[in-house]
């Protein structure tokens, strides 16, 4: 039995007196105040823009390169920019325009997202930023950043007397 009721502070999660993090709301000076985000008027396209703005990008490292893959369905390669800024920051950006609406059309559902996106990645020191390559195929952007070869350790033989 908990000494603190389940609906205390209306957080939706069960409080546990033995869990030091379950009572964090007590010490939060802003807890219970209305969120400013909830009072901001949202356009009808805000949700779809947010979905596209958070373009998901995978980053893997192989022995030869850093490889970035982004799912960008419906985006043309002309609408995507891949840049290296400040010497070691990879910037991937672009936009997908919203379809032109005809006055006689009635939309029953709009689930495809549109809008702008931009993601930045700080590249490691071993990246060859002057040899970055990018390609787009079937709505997937692939950016390859080659790596410098790791310096081979120099071995010096020591004579034993």
From Swiss-Prot:
- Can you name the source organism? Oxybasis rubra
Q: Give the matching PANTHER family.
A: HEAT-SHOCK PROTEIN 20 FAMILY MEMBER
Kindly indicate whether the keyword Mitochondrion belongs to this entry.
no
**In the UniProt record, does the keyword Transcription regulation occur?**
no
**CDD domains, from UniProt?**
ACD_ScHsp26_like (cd06472)
Which InterPro entries does UniProt cross-reference here? Answer: A-crystallin/Hsp20_dom, HSP20-like_chaperone, Small_HSP
One GO CC annotation, please? Answer: cytoplasm
The entry sums up its family as follows: Belongs to the small heat shock protein (HSP20) family.
Superkingdom, natural source: Eukaryota
Q: Alphabetically list the UniProt keywords.
A: Cytoplasm, Stress response
* Name of the molecule in the record: 18.3 kDa class I heat shock protein
């Amino acid at each position: 039995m908990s000494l603190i009721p389940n609906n205390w502070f209306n957080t939706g999660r069960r409080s546990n007196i033995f869990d030091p993090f379950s009572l964090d709301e007590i010490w939060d000076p802003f807890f219970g105040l209305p969120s400013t985000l909830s009072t901001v008027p949202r356009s009808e396209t805000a949700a779809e823009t947010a979905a596209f703005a958070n373009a998901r990008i995978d980053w893997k490292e192989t022995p030869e390169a850093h490889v970035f893959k982004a799912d960008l369905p419906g985006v043309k390669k002309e609408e995507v920019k891949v840049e290296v800024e400040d010497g070691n920051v990879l910037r991937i950006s672009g936009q997908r325009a919203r379809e032109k609406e005809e006055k006689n059309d009635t939309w029953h559902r709009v689930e495809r997202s549109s809008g702008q996106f931009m993601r930045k990645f700080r590249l490691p020191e071993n990246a060859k930023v002057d040899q970055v390559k990018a390609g787009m195929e079937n709505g997937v952007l692939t950016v390859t950043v080659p790596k410098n070869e790791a310096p081979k350790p120099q071995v010096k033989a020591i004579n034993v007397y």
